[in-house]
Every structure is written in C-alpha cells, then in structure tokens.
C-alpha cells in the first residue's frame, strides 16, 4: 500500500519486502526499519519469560502424554533481515523461537507465500532437527494445514506479522483464536493505514472481519480506534477485551509506526506481557 522504502544500499525495497542486496550467505533478507529490533526484543523476552509455563507442556504428567508447545508464524519471511538505515544483518523472528533453549518449542510452524523466501527458509533451517515445518503458500488458503501442525492440547503462540495490511484475513485469525491455548502477537500497521486510509477500506474490512470500523474511522487521526475494534473481535474467542494489550512501537521521531497487539486467554500470560512492556528494548520505562 505504501511507497517502497529505500535502504542504505540504494534502490527501493522489493515488492515482497526484501532488500535488493542478498545477505552474507547469498540468500534473500527482508528489509526492515530499526524498530523491528524493538519487536524482536519484546518477542524474545516473552519467549524467555514463558519458559516455565511452557515446560509443563513438554513433559508427560499424571500418566498423560505431553501436550507440546508450538511457535507459529503466518508471514515468516526469508529468516534474516537487514536494517535499512544501517545495513546491520539480524536474525529473522523465526530464529527467536528456533534458537531458544530454555524450554524449546516442540513444533515450529512457519508459513510463507513468497517462493524465494520459502527456498531461503528451507536452506537456513536445513541443519536443524525435525521440529520445523514450513508451509509454502498463502496462509489464508493454507490455514487448515497450518492448524493441523499445531498441538491441539499444547501451549502455543502465533506471531502474525504481515507485510502491510492486505495479506491477512480475519477468518485466518479466527482459526488460530479458536484453539484452546493460543497466544497471539499481532503486528497492526497503524501508520501504513493512516497514510493510505482513502484506499485501504477493503484491506481493513478483511483484516478486522467487520464493516463496523467505517462508523468510527472518518479521518487518519481515528485509525487508532481500529485497534479497539480488533480487540472486540477477538473477545468472541475467549480473549477478554479489556485484557487484550496494544503496545505502540515508535520510530526515532516518536511517531507510532505500528501497534503490537498481545492477546491471551490466560491470566499469567497477561501478567508476563505487562511486565515485559514496562521496559523498552532500550531499557527505558514503558507503558505499564
């Protein structure tokens, strides 16, 4: 929806969000802003902070088999990224889960529609054990296959981080949200919607699964109200509306780039997220 970004290497970002210059391993890398490191930091701290709860699902108990624990990404990208303002190469978000050793996920499900990214993911995860499942194709069309890979009785988390607003449909979120234990971390592209509000109507409706937003969003300044509508939509699946958290991620000018929305059906999960949100990636006091 928005104009392609330019990075320090010159040239616009590719339509799939990748940098024009490959990584040092010769494979594609996603081109991201420096604020991506903030998102990764929150996710990394969350994965670490939930290891005690997750470990209970990784071992048999009371004669019952282990429930398991899955990490899911609907828009996994190529597995590595480059900060467009500095050229720094960083691991993609899938590797936050892959490399976590405290209470390792029993299943890692990565969905990606771009063929070049799928090929890069396959190569970058080739030496790993059999935990990783890569689903090639549009996550909206392959969601049943994705859900089939997730432990039904496990403690699971899904990162929903689309490149822009267009690729995601609420029906896809609904399939994940209907699972008994599924924490959601959703990238909500607030600034992108503000910049393109006049032509983003169809995208917003598909993302939120409702037309109600048209009654409350009349100008770009109203876009933040969309977050509340998404919260109310998730409430239908057991995520208490007042407990669905939204964390604004800002750029260097202090403008909000996007909201990182966290939803859980578990009281402990909210407590953990609130603790994490109190401190930013730079060690500053956060919102709570």
Question: Where on the chain are the PLM-derived regions?
Answer:
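Class I SAM-dependent methyltransferase Rossmann-like catalytic core
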Residues: 2-66, 86
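SAM cofactor-binding core of SAM-dependent methyltransferases
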Residues: 41-145
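Short, conserved loop/helix-junction motifs that constitute active-site signature segments
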Residues: 100-103, 176-180
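Short amphipathic alpha-helix with an adjacent loop that forms part of the alpha/beta core around
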Residues: 142-151, 174
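A short, conserved alpha-helix within the catalytic core of class I
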Residues: 165-176
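Conserved beta-strand signature within the Rossmann-like core of class I S-adenosyl-L-methionine
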Residues: 180-195
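A conserved mid-domain beta-alpha-beta active-site/ligand-binding segment of alpha/beta enzyme cores
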Residues: 195-252
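Flexible, glycine-/basic-rich loop-and-beta segments that form/coincide
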Residues: 267-288
């Amino acid at each position: 929806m928005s104009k392609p970004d330019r990075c320090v290497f010159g040239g616009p970002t590719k339509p799939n969000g990748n940098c024009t210059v490959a990584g040092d391993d010769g494979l594609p890398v996603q081109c991201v802003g420096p604020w991506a490191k903030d998102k990764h930091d929150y996710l990394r701290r969350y994965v670490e902070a939930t290891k005690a709860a997750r470990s209970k699902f990784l071992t048999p108990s009371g004669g019952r088999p282990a429930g398991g624990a899955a990490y899911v990404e609907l828009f996994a990208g190529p597995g590595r990224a480059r900060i467009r303002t500095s050229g720094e190469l960083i691991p993609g978000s899938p590797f936050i889960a892959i490399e976590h050793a405290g209470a390792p996920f029993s299943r890692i499900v990565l969905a990606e529609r771009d063929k070049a990214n799928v090929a890069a993911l396959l190569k970058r995860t080739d030496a790993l054990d059999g935990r990783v499942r890569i689903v090639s194709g549009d996550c909206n069309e392959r969601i049943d296959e994705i859900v089939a890979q997730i432990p039904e009785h496990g403690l699971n988390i899904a990162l929903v981080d689309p490149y822009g607003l267009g690729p995601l449909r609420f029906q896809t979120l609904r399939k994940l949200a209907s699972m008994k234990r599924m924490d959601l971390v959703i990238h909500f592209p607030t600034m992108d919607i503000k910049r393109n509000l006049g032509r983003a109507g169809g995208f917003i409706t598909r993302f939120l699964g409702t037309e109600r937003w048209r009654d409350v969003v009349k100008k770009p300044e109203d876009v933040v109200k969309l977050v509340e509508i998404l919260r109310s939509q998730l409430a239908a699946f057991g995520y208490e509306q007042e407990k669905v958290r939204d964390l604004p991620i800002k750029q260097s000018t202090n403008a909000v780039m996007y909201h990182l929305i966290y939803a859980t059906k578990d009281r402990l999960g909210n407590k953990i997220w609130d603790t994490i949100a109190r401190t930013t990636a730079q060690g500053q006091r956060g919102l709570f």
